[in-house]
Structure formats: structure tokens, C-alpha cells
Amino acid sequence: MSFLDRSFELHFNERPYLNHFSYLFITKTTRERSRSRSNFSILCRGNIIPKEVRDKDAVSRFLESVDQFERILNDSVFIRLERLTTDEIVGTPQQAGLIEKYFSLSQQDTTTLKDIQMSASEMRIGDDILCVHTLSDVDDLPGSVQTDTRYEKYSTDRSDCRLSFAAPVGLMLSCDHIYNQFLFIDDSAEILQRFEKTARNMHSLSKYSCANQLNKQWIDAYLDEAHSFGLTAIRCHCNVMAWSDSREKLKVIKNDTGSALALMGCKPRYNTIDAPALYWAGIPGGEGDFPSEESFFTFVEQGVCFFTEETNYADSLSPFGIKMADRTNGKPLHLDISDEPMRRGITTNRNKLVIGPSGSGKSFFMNHLVRQYWEQNTHIILIDIGNSYKGLCDLIHQRKNGEDGIYYTYSEKHPIAFNPFFTEDKVFDLEKKESIKTLIMSLWKRDTEVITRAEEVALSMAVNLFLEKIKEDNELVPSFNTFYEFVQGEFRGILEEKHYREKDFDLTNFLNVLAPYYRGGEYDYLLNSDEQLDLLNKRFVVFEIDEIKEHKILFPVVTVIIMEAFINKMRRLHGVRKMIVVEEAWKAIAREGMADYIKFLYKTVRKYFGEAVVVTQELDDIVSSPIIKDTIINNADCKILLDQRKYINKFDSVQSLLGLTDKEKGQILSINQANDPARKYKEVWIGLGGVQSAVYATETSVEEYLTYTTEETEKLEVTQMTEKLGGNMEQAIRVLAKEKKKKK
């Protein structure tokens, strides 16, 4: 585990969060049992097994129905059921089962036996005091219910963030609790017949009381609804069981639970009398013992509205991924946005498009992503403008004792320099030869000049002969200088032997045009680097091109070398993950006629276990280049958006261009709307193939923050402390992080 990985783990160590488990129990009961009241519970009787349970045909029909129900839900793709085994329900000597966990109010695999105490005023399980709120009467319910509702904290005037109707009593209720939802499927026809009989009785008694007439009207409305739309009549009950071992905390929990029910439009009802019976009926498989007087009549459609549909963010079931955090409770997450989505058929490639305005945390997120990819043995080439990756690259360079973390940048004192003719193994495959020819061609001919077939053949011959000489002559130092001298001397003689005419290949013109790159020329440093550096085996390489992006000579050369370096990795590193990240520099690359290369890259890199990532501030930049627009958007199945509030009024065009759904739009516009002030983080939306999307928190340790930061003052702090500690950047980050933690 690396220093930064360890600091991430320690940052989240022992952080409390609300965990969520969901169980669906389908219980077979009898007509008599379903009508029984709380005073007829099995707690009060000796014989607990009804005779219908011993009817093999009835049991067989029930199990067939359950199998069919399971198959229907699993086939829907949206939800998946996993059937519990007998050991998982009743437990084993080594591991607690679900029933044991229920009786101890714990999800731990090892549980302790706890006394259950019941009195008229409260119910205790061990040290915990139970607090039960119920929805068991129609009078306590709102006038209407719905499957989902608008969550104001994450909504804007232009977007909705939708949560399930019962979300306030699910994960939004931040205390230990169980939310039970009971749906009793009785004989619907029999229920409706009973209601019709009751309505007639009410009509007969209406002259004695207006209330009877009013009740008849309500019953008639229920019957009309059932018959008009063919609805199934059912009974329903919901309750929230919360607990605490402290009476003071229990008061707060009681108020919080009541407030959560009020948010649903329900009247909070605190239940003490029936708490034991409700707790008993909540035992897995014990729902048949539910007291019927605690239920109300409704229809299936309205009953399922009381289900909670949210759960904790799940870790990816993959060994590869990045570490993010749950936006609501700060739980650390393992997230795979490259391999797992492809395995599951959600995406068809690993390419990514990252969009975030200045100040949205775009560079910070990208630092976090590439650092973790690098630590998982990914080869990464970054093309940057603005020194966003300088801190991370320096740290890697120091950790690897200069063997990795290569940072190319241009300054007057230290101009950028390469050696395209050097490889550690002296292997020059077809791609390498073609890239050298392309490089020399770009130096020799302008874009407007046409190269003839004869010139192309001569240049190809010169390159191939020189590369052969490098392999044979161990004394020869490969560089542009020695190539120039080879062409000037040996190759001139070869051309004369082959009777090349000047009009076919003007050697003098060739040498004159390339003279500025030869020893003593204006750009003699560019292709004659003294560093024997082969980028093929360097896993983290940054090209910072801010100073040369407008340079007509240097920029095209650097661009060709960058592309050659990545293609070389693509072709030669088999079974190794490759990533190229093009920050704002892609605009300059496209302008220099490299749009076709990006197009090729996005369509081809998938076949070589690679991924291309383009990072931009505004979508308009991409739209302005038709080739880029069609290629990047259509071939980047992973789209990553940061805070878009600056563009909220024109987000419809972004939605249309990226093909986002209204749900995805709502998620994106909810970014950073209700961040927890106790945590330092920014949110990011990740969408995969138009199928799966969520908002995550980019929350890091102080050590990671100091490594990634692009704030000038903070970068300066790290630099000064590094110098003070004799150049040890890792130690400098540790010292500064310790100081900042003390100030909190």
C-alpha cells in the first residue's frame, strides 16, 4: 500500500455511517390467522402450527408462486433477489442467522443473547429501548401518495432530484432503525363483498347519523375505484422501529422519526401498547402473526408507494478501480469505471469525457484518478496545459528514484528535448519507423507542400538504413545529429549509386531545411537529448505544453513525439493497461491537424486494453470541432461531469448533445447543492453508457490534497517544505498534513 493509499484509509478510519440491508419476506398464512388480533398472538397460545401448513399441495403451490415472483423480479434487471439459505436464516454454531440478528438488533455475524423486557410503557431488548412509530390508520395518511417525490435539498428551479416517497424513513433517517412494510394479500373479492355489505348497512343507518352516510360514500368511492380499474384490495401497515441505550438519545430519535413521517405528509403515531406484538410480527417468517387491527385497507398500487427504494452506494465487484466516497454519508467506496461496466455490457469501451468549468475540481479529480490508475500498473501519458499534474509527477519521480514520473516542459533555461532514435532494446517496429518518418516529414515539408512518391521512398530508405546501422554499430550514438551526418555522408553515396536525380529527391534542400535541428542550429536541442530515455517502459509521463502551444516549429514536433510514444505503448505493451489523458491541450492538437489522430485513438485504443480521456472546461469547445464532437462524444461511454451550475440556464443544449435523460440532468444539477460542511470534498457525476449513473464525492486525505492541489499558495508551501527537508517531498507532505490537522 502506497503512502497516499494509506493516508486515504486513515482519513476514513472509524468514520460512522448508516448501513442499509433490505430483506423481502413472503409468508404463507391462513384466512383465520390473517384476521387474528393482537390478543390472539402465538405469544398467548400453545399450538402455533396451523393445519394448513401440513397440506403438501398448498405448500407446493405457495413455493411455485414464490419461484415465479422471484423470476419476474430478477428478469426486470432493475432489482435482483438473492434467496436466503436455511443457515442464513436460522444461523449456525459459528455464524448468527437473520433471526438471531433480529433478536439482538444487530447485523453482526456474531451476536449475543439479550433479554426482552415488555411493560405497558416501553419495550427493552438488552440495554436498548425500543421506540415504535406506526402507520396503521387511514386517518394518519396523506390525501395522496406517489412512487417518488421531489427532494428539495438536491433540486433546483430547473431540475428535480427524485427520491422514493418513503425515503425520509429509509437512509435519510440517520439512526439505528428498522423500517417494516407489510402488504397482506387476502381474498380481494371477499374483501370487496364485505365492503358492499358494510355500505348497505351504513345506508340503512344513515338516517340515524350523518357519519354513517359519509362512511357509505367513502366505501362506495373505494368500491368504484376497485371495479373501474380492476384493482386488488389489500391490507397494509408500516412501522419504524428505532432504538437507543440512552433515554436522552431516544428523545432525539423519537423526534427525528416523527419529523421524517411528517415529511411524508403522515401523522406521526407513537405506539407503546402494541409494540411487543409488532416486534413479534416482524420476526422473519412471523408476519402471519400480525395483529389485523394495526392494518388499513388500500390497493396494491398505493401500498407499494410506501416502499423505500434507496440504498447505500455499492462497491464494485472488481479488483481494479478508484476510491471515492458516498455523497450523503461519506462512506468510502471502491469504484470501477473501466473494466466492470464492460464485463456487464453497460459500456463498449473505456474512453472517458470529463467536463468541468474552472474551479469545479476537475484537475483535482483527474489527479485522484490517474494516481490510483498508476498505482495499479497503468501506463499513463498526460498532455497538460497549466502544470496541474506537477506535484503528483514529482512525488512519483522521487518514489521511483527518477525511473518514473517523467515531466516534459519548456523553459528558456531547460528547453524540451527528445531523442526519437533511442530505444533501450534497439527494436524498431513498423510503427516506430513510421513515426520517425512522419516526424522528419513534418520538419521537412509544410502542411501545404505535397511530398512526392519518390521523396517518400528516399526518406523511408534513409530511415531504414540508419536504423539498421544503429543495430549493427554499438559505438554509434543514436540521435538526430548522427542521422543527419549519415544522410550527409553515407546516404549521399547510396543515392549516387542508385542514380537518384535531384528532381526526384533534392538532398541539398533536405539537409538545408533540417539544418536548424542539427548541431549548432537554432533547435539543435530538440531531437538530440542526452538523456537515454525510452518512454516505452515509463508508466507516468507528463507533457506540459503551455509555453509551446502557439509555437509553429516546436509544437508540431512535440505533438508527433507524444502520439508516437503512446502508439508505441499500444502496439508493444500487450496485456498492460494504457491511458492517454488530453487536458485542454486537445484544442491545440486539433488545430494542428491532429484531429484525425484523436479520432483514430478513440476508435482504436479499446482493442489494445487502453483508454483515451479528454478533459475540457466547456462543451462548446468540443462542438466547434465536428470531427472531435462526433468522435469523442460517440466513443466515450464514460462521461464525467463536475459542477455545472454556471451553465444551468443553458444546460438543455448540453443535455441534448450528450444524450442525457431527465434523471441524469437532475443528478448533474444537484452536484454540490447540499454538501456537508463538516467534510471537505467536491462532487462529481459519473455516467456509464447511458445505463448507470450516480453522483460521488471526491473526498481525500490532507496528504492527497496537498499532492493534488493546484492552488499557488498551497503548492508553494509544499515546495518550500520540500527544500527545507532536503528535497524529500513525501516527508514534506507528511509534516504539512500533520500541521493542518492540528489546526482543525
Protein language model regions, located:
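P-loop NTPase motor core of the ASCE superfamily
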Residues: 9-13, 427-481, 626-744
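Extended, folded cores of ATP/NTP-driven motor/assembly subunits in large transport
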Residues: 1-304, 308-309
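Short glycine/proline-enriched loop/turn "hinge" motifs that connect secondary-structure elements
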Residues: 13-18, 228-233, 325-327, 343-346, ...
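Short, flexible loop/turn elements at secondary-structure junctions
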Residues: 28-30, 244-246, 324-328, 337-339, ...
